[in-house]
Regions:
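Post-Walker A alpha-helix
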Residues: 54-55
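Short hydrophobic/aromatic-rich motifs at helix boundaries and adjacent loops
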Residues: 2-3, 26-27, 139-143
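Charged, amphipathic alpha-helical linker segments immediately N-terminal to NTP-binding catalytic cores
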Residues: 1-23, 199
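Pre-Walker A adenine-sensing motif
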Residues: 20-36
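Glycine-rich, often acidic-flanked micro-motifs
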Residues: 32, 36-45, 60-204
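Conserved lysine of the Walker
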Residues: 51
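Walker A (P-loop) phosphate-binding loop of P-loop NTPases
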Residues: 48
């Protein structure tokens, strides 16, 4: 019952909240996010790229998790804030084992406890996970930024040009204020600590 309640809460705080925000012209991204002191970092990537696993790893390291798979962003003067939306965090079995968490053998994904925070955090940097033969962090510039982030927008209206213009306008404002980096790493959990170190060098 607890897992079912957690799934419902995750849906409410994630997809349902994102839908209502999108209808109001607000921005949510398919992403995970973690608070780093008084700032925050956001992570995007294809399904299975490790966004949730990395957020859970950072949570285990003591950094509060703001979002698991949907991050809600609000503009505040010259910055963007990540609103907390983490109600339940779910991981695949192999990720649980790698993080030393006992997996729920009766379910495809296991609900895990992570450190959370109740207030919004200023977004310092965004990172896009890609496969590479070593851990590398490079700044993304130009139209490639839109190419990376546009598919990550939580959209629920697809056939209205005005809605698309609003989405692109929000993305443009976001990218003008918050840097986007590509973070390459080999597949596997043994590189999580190095990825954390390189990320912290950018954010802190």
């Amino acid at each position: 019952a607890d897992a079912d309640a957690g799934s419902v809460d995750k849906l409410k705080q994630g997809a349902v909240r994102a839908m209502l925000r999108h209808l109001r012209g607000e921005l949510s991204l398919h992403a995970s996010a973690v608070a780093i002191g008084k700032r925050s970092a956001l992570f995007v990537g294809a399904s299975g790229s490790g966004k949730s696993t990395f957020a859970a790893y950072l949570g285990e390291r003591g950094w509060p998790v703001l979002a698991d798979d949907v991050a809600h962003l609000d503009q505040s003067e010259d910055a963007f804030l990540v609103q907390p939306s983490e109600g339940a965090h779910f991981l695949m079995h192999d990720a649980c084992v790698a993080l030393g968490i006992a997996p729920d053998e009766e379910r495809v994904k296991t609900r895990v406890a992570v450190k959370t925070v109740g207030e919004a955090s200023k977004l310092a940097a965004m990172f896009s996970f890609v496969d590479d033969d070593a851990v590398r962090v490079t700044r993304v510039a130009g139209y490639e930024m839109i190419q990376i982030l546009s598919p990550c927008v939580a959209r629920f209206v697809f056939d209205e040009p005005a809605a698309l213009r609003t989405d692109l306008g929000r993305l443009g404002t976001l990218l003008a204020k918050v840097p986007l980096y590509r973070i390459g790493r080999p597949r596997g959990f043994e590189h999580l600590a190095e990825v954390e170190q390189r990320m912290l060098e950018v954010v802190q």
